[in-house]
UniProtKB/Swiss-Prot annotation:
Localisation per UniProt entry: Cytoplasm
Record: residues binding 1-deoxy-D-xylulose 5-phosphate: 156, 182-183, 204-205
Gene that encodes it: thiG
UniProt family annotation: Belongs to the ThiG family.
Species of the source: Escherichia coli (strain K12)
Gene Ontology biological process terms in this record: thiamine biosynthetic process; thiamine diphosphate biosynthetic process
Residues at the active site: 95
Known role: Catalyzes the rearrangement of 1-deoxy-D-xylulose 5-phosphate (DXP) to produce the thiazole phosphate moiety of thiamine. Sulfur is provided by the thiocarboxylate moiety of the carrier protein ThiS. In vitro, sulfur can be provided by H(2)S.
Protein name, entry field: Thiazole synthase
Involved pathway(s): Cofactor biosynthesis; thiamine diphosphate biosynthesis
Key words, A-Z: Cytoplasm, Schiff base, Thiamine biosynthesis, Transferase
């Protein structure tokens, strides 16, 4: 069971809504993933219409919606988008994204921290997408963010946990949930994130662009479950030396 702010989730896999070939395929994949928290970009939906092609099936599916501020380049733009989302969707939950460079889509640490502090004061449950910077993640936690969402690699790159060393520090020092977001390309990446101590992962591109998004979503669900179970089972420690699993000389001594 994963708890973030006032909500609990059975699934440790969060999903996105972008890049799917159709809304129907998107919903089928989300259901197959078992995800209970789904993020959506405000710029992709008509907030005035609950029968929007993306919004309506998500509401019908009964998932928790996590609007994001993707496309915002400054703290001010993100705060404005957050208030639009709260008014239209009736939720205080927000994935804070501020990335001014459209080529790399890397989060702006200064603007993100600035916006997070203001939004928390205004009553939002803020989950900030951020770089894998342990100092920044701690600062975001200190200003009241409900979780932190450091990247594994650039958005949509499918490179995996390229920031693993920093993620390990973030996880070790965090007192709020850590959700690895961005760059996760295959289910094994998700399993590794859970094994190393992450509380959840957010996956979008890897599922949406797969030849079979529904089966890929199932694969991610199983990988997250396996990674969490492995961590809870207490993996053995790594060693520089070999350690035999069977006696090496006993049978020789017995036959002598």
């Amino acid at each position: 069971m994963l708890r973030i702010a006032d909500k609990t989730f059975d699934s440790h896999l969060f999903t996105g809504t972008g890049k799917f070939a159709s809304s129907q395929l998107m919903v089928e994949a989300i259901r197959a993933s078992g995800s209970q928290l789904v993020t959506l970009a405000m710029k992709r939906v008509d907030l005035r219409q609950h029968n929007d092609a993306i919004l309506e099936p998500l509401i019908a599916a009964g998932v928790t919606l996590l609007p994001n501020t993707s496309g915002a380049k400054t703290a001010e733009e993100a705060i404005f988008a957050a208030h639009l989302a709260r008014e239209a969707l009736g939720t205080n939950w927000l994935k804070l994204e501020i990335h001014p460079d459209a080529r790399w889509l890397l989060p702006d640490p200064i603007e993100t921290l600035k916006a997070a502090e203001t939004l928390v004061q205004q009553g939002f449950v803020v989950l900030p997408y951020c770089g894998a910077d342990p100092v920044l993640c701690k600062r975001l936690e200190e200003v009241g963010c409900a979780a932190v969402m450091p990247l594994g690699a650039p958005i949509g790159s499918n490179q995996g946990l390229e920031t693993r060393a920093m993620l390990e520090i973030i996880i070790q020092q965090a007192t709020v949930p850590v959700v690895v977001d961005a760059g996760i390309g295959v289910p094994s990446h998700a399993a590794q994130a859970l094994e190393m101590g992450a509380d959840a992962v957010l996956v979008n591109t890897a599922i949406a662009v797969a030849d079979d998004p529904v089966n890929m979503a199932k694969a991610f669900r199983l990988a997250v479950e396996a990674g969490l179970l492995a961590r809870q089972s207490g993996p053995g420690s790594r060693s520089y030396f070999a350690h035999a699993t069977s006696p090496l000389t006993g049978f020789l001594e017995a036959s002598a």
